[in-house]
């Protein structure tokens, strides 16, 4: 009898039509972090932090960089004889200088405001070298004897190519008065210098005059230099020193020189023919004959990601630099595939609903339905809610970029030895800015991930509520994301539930009768259980009374119990 009842129950269950609401799941192992959780496995995720580069120096948008090899910027601009390959250079996208280039100031000394000049070069893409005071024009001074073994060329003493070291001629050094008027339409970079002899003897041997000066004047510059004669240690075999200076001469402005000795005169100047975004990078990386839109000192970045952690100094169309090691954006749902548990599967397929886990069988949408009826079973994605969700997450990366559209740029400023405290302060400020920038990026990703996952959960709940409000009491909520119909629901009926056109009145009478039938079965079962309970109680009491009476008679017969009547 029990087997028959169980079989009838199974048949009844099989015949029950069901519809379940669930979400997509897959075999993804991608994980993201949120505000509340770490390492949440999701169906889809997008890494938004670029961590790789090609390890090469590349052309930037088709324009080659100026790679100075073993020359410094000072060696290039002054014309160190070992830097002759850079006498005339084409347009550059950025400048590359080694950390400690061998060919710097061959004659020992100092380049004043060198760091400021480098900063100026970060906004220039092309120089045109022009002659402003020909070497042959110094008829009253020796213009070819100013050479040094510290600046050798092909085994002989030489000097910087772009300036002239003027020496006395015929034991005389007449006072120099020279001017140059910038008739060009472009700004002009002009360089000059002063020589500081080792002693008085060298001073008179080279310049005849024991007391000398150099005066330089423009509309914005008023400078007077005097040599500093002192005994010094030898550098590159020289006890003397040279200081070099520069200025930007505006169009229609003139530069005036006056000197009676120790003058390093300009022969060539640099016309600034093209300004634009550039940079001076300290790098030991080799040129790779490649092209890129973003260059760092470590190598080129070719990426569409919004962030990178390669190097703070970049040039070009680059991702934003952060110190993070991981920035992964959730674009899909929590990934919790339904477990293969026999008791949870149901008889018509892998239906677990959104509480127990996602469906790997639903591949054409993020949210949807699984139905089962006499015509069969199957999955169907909810196109409308899926498309809205896709539209929402598609704009997520752009949203993050918009929220962080003001990037702090570490421009790689340089400081001289007298500015070390400023340099240290600048580094601390840059590090502080980058720390804040990184924190903001990480926090934004965590918040967006939390919002995305909550958004998906909300969409599933909304879909569930949409079905629940349609079916009302025509179906029973099973508590796992599924509804069991109280009426027959064929494929057309299932489709009406999915598209929101379910006709509740059409099925309400059939559902009411089914509910009453189920209630009657329950009441009948309760009545049967009550009869069986009463019968069991009476029978048990009767048996107990007979046993007590029998025991009493036995005890009376053997004298163990006195019986009085």
Swiss-Prot record:
The gene is HA. It is a single-pass type I membrane protein. This is Hemagglutinin. Belongs to the influenza viruses hemagglutinin family. Major glycoprotein, comprises over 80% of the envelope proteins present in virus particle. The extent of infection into host organism is determined by HA. Influenza viruses bud from the apical surface of polarized epithelial cells (e.g. bronchial epithelial cells) into lumen of lungs and are therefore usually pneumotropic. The reason is that HA is cleaved by tryptase clara which is restricted to lungs. However, HAs of H5 and H7 pantropic avian viruses subtypes can be cleaved by furin and subtilisin-type enzymes, allowing the virus to grow in other organs than lungs. Residues 17-530 are extracellular. It comes from Influenza A virus (strain A/Goose/Guangxi/345/2005 H5N1 genotype G). Pfam families: Hemagglutinin. Residues 1-16 form the signal peptide. Keywords: Clathrin- and caveolin-independent endocytosis of virus by host, Clathrin-mediated endocytosis of virus by host, Disulfide bond, Fusion of virus membrane with host endosomal membrane, Fusion of virus membrane with host membrane, Glycoprotein, Hemagglutinin, Host cell membrane, Host membrane, Host-virus interaction, Lipoprotein, Membrane, Palmitate, Signal, Transmembrane, Transmembrane helix, Viral attachment to host cell, Viral envelope protein, Viral penetration into host cytoplasm, Virion, Virus endocytosis by host, Virus entry into host cell. GO terms for cellular component: host cell plasma membrane; membrane; viral envelope; virion membrane. Glycans are attached at residues 26-27, 39, 181, 302, 499.
